[in-house]
Design a protein with these regions (language model features):
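A short acidic, helix-capping loop that chelates divalent metal ions and anchors anionic groups
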Residues: 87-92, 127, 161-166
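Acidic (Asp/Glu)-rich catalytic clusters
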Residues: 10-14, 41-45, 67-75, 107-111, ...
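Short aromatic-enriched loop/helix-cap "lid" or pocket-rim segments at secondary-structure transitions
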Residues: 34, 64, 130, 163-167
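Core AdoMet radical
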Residues: 1-31, 42-62, 75-102, 115-117, ...
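N-terminal active-site wall of soluble small-molecule enzyme domains
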Residues: 36-39
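Aromatic/hydrophobic pocket-lining residues that form the small-molecule binding cavity
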Residues: 3, 34, 63, 102, ...
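Conserved C-terminal portion of the radical SAM core fold
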Residues: 77, 100-163, 180-189
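Flexible, glycine- and charge-enriched loops at secondary-structure boundaries
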Residues: 1, 95-99, 127-134, 169-177
Length: 190
């Protein structure tokens, strides 16, 4: 029923869509409950590529065979919210683990034949972290086995008032658009 409702909502606009994005914040972390969902997607959207989001630290708990299985069910791309390659900034953002932990995850995804979308938050940490965030994120990207079909997303970070992050009082970047351009140029050179 839910899929029929979505199809009705999209109407002819569905023809503009290329693939199915599992829009839960961490859909690929579901493990076994994900399998019937992928079967439904395959039945209602035959041949359409499936994409989903995964946080880095949940993905580390999955065996390479899991990713191969999902690839066989239509999964084509996994988006990873890496956020930064700078460990102190990752800790400040209250994310567990170390940025380098993305290396074995991306290797496993690539070995399973999946493409990867790496998401970095440009501007996170403000002025205090800008250079280390830039330098270490690019160095980590250079270590990843990315290739054709993979994507690096540079997401502009904007502070929301009243959040724990805002309470830190970090001075934001003065020119976020300029910083995004700097990152984009550097990523293209990798």
């Amino acid at each position: 029923e839910r899929i029929q409702a979505v199809l009705a909502l999209l109407g002819r606009g569905r023809l503009l869509r290329r693939g199915v994005f599992l829009a839960d914040g961490n859909a690929l972390a579901l493990s076994e409950p994900l399998l019937p969902l992928l079967e439904l997607v395959r039945a209602h959207f035959p041949g359409e590529p499936v994409m989903g989001f995964l946080d880095l630290f949940t993905g580390l708990k999955k065996a390479p065979s899991w990713w191969e299985r999902l690839g066989g069910m239509g999964l084509r791309r996994v988006y990873i919210g890496l956020e930064t390659g700078h460990a102190p900034l990752l800790a400040l953002l209250r994310k567990p683990g170390h940025p380098k932990e993305v290396l074995p995850l991306v290797r496993a995804l690539k070995a399973a034949g999946l493409s990867v979308g790496v998401i970095l938050m440009v501007g996170a940490g403000g002025k205090a972290f800008a250079e280390a965030h830039f330098r270490e994120s690019l160095a980590l990207l250079a270590e990843l086995p990315l290739g054709r079909g993979d994507v690096v997303y540079l997401s502009p970070f904007r502070e929301d008032p009243g959040t724990p992050y805002a309470a830190l009082g970090l001075a934001p970047l003065e020119d976020l658009e300029g910083e995004l351009q700097r990152w984009a140029q550097a990523v293209r050179r990798l």
